[in-house]
């Protein structure tokens, strides 16, 4: 999060963003991309018999290495740092970035559908190349 300082420049920038950038068209594109990404990742996980969860709010998605946790203890038990590091390095080496620590992604209005497909395919490739049982550490 950020803090808005109460000055004329900030309010002018906010007004311009709300008028020209945050439109129904851009939101529709973001949500369409997020839906494609959610479905693509779910297909990757399902095809490999993984019960991993995807959380989505608008154009923001993240996934976890197990069912959706109900509390912090469950979330901690689902953490798989070795797998997470391998996943992030694999993706970085292919020009793709997923937010560290919680595997978060945002879909921008101009994000091409092909980029979403590439990310989903790359996640599938890394999962096919690691021993998921050994990555519990």
Task: Name the predicted role of every residue range.
Residues 1-137:
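Conserved N-terminal phosphate-binding loop of PLP-dependent enzymes in the Aspartate aminotransferase
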